[in-house]
Amino acid sequence: MNVPVDSDVVVTVPSQAAFVHVLRSVAASVAARTDLPVDDIDDLRMAIDEASSQLLMLGSSPATLTLRLRAIDGGVEAVVSVDGSAPAEWPPPAFHDSLAWNVLSALSDELSFELPDGAPAIRVVKRSSARSDA
């Protein structure tokens, strides 16, 4: 592994869909350096894309979108957040029944919603599918 465990990589971009590709690319780069298989890297990229899209649709006009990546034992933890305050209910009440929830759940090994400093965030953990439990 080329990325030390528990080292954070943080990227902040303007909160516009045109910049989400930067977050996906950085996530793929960090994941590749943790020796995740290509399919797992693709899953992480798609999860970052979906999480970013959901946060951008909150409609609170956040100025920035931030991705924090951390190499963990056997995978990568990613937290995507927007600046500003969360909606009255976070996650939105119907989110667990949505296609976005199903997509994020299928692409990640762990999925949670957070409110660091009162700002909405989506946390995704992707572990290596090639890792042996023996």
Predicted regions and their residues:
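Bergerat-fold GHKL ATPase/HATPase_c domain
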Residues: 1-46, 134
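Generic secondary-structure microfeatures
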Residues: 15, 48-52, 82-84
